[in-house]
Amino acid sequence: DVSDEIRNKIFPIGEGQGIIVGSQIIRDQFTTDDVRRDATFLEIYSKDIETGQPKYYSNIVLKGQGLTKDGYRHFCSDVIIYRYADILLLTAEAKNALNMDPSSEINEIRKRAYKDKYEQHIFTKGTQAENDKAILKERLLEFAFEGKRWWDLIRFDAAFELVPSLSLFNGNKAKLLF
């Protein structure tokens, strides 16, 4: 039993496209006070049969939905190649590689993402490895479902560590080509 409001946001699908459901692994990376969470996912709740209370059912990814007109969904969303947040995080990555402080770029992203809760999420420079980890996570949160994650994992040499299904390949980097 899903509300009409949610049903109207999800359907119609149209033009041969389906719905993308975000994995729990990715959804768990977002904190509830990060505005990117609600811009990335629509959580779907149904009523619990026994209690009548809302119960989490699933989610859909909101990015690239296009628009709905006259009962049809038109997938007309532009594919984003680069945006300002990408430039900031690439700058942070380059600064960190040069042993410079990437805090200002990361914090500029976080100010927008956390708004009035920003003070609880201020980034301060750590070791080069800690900074890399923070930049990689920030890129996940900022660019989820925009086609950048795989290349970030390759560039940071983190694919085997962060993609559980790659454990089958025992670190064989030749398997990372595609």
Report the location of each language-model feature.
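Polar, glycine-rich mid-to-C-terminal structural blocks
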Residues: 1-26
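Acidic/polar-rich alpha-helix caps and helix-coil junctions
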Residues: 31-178
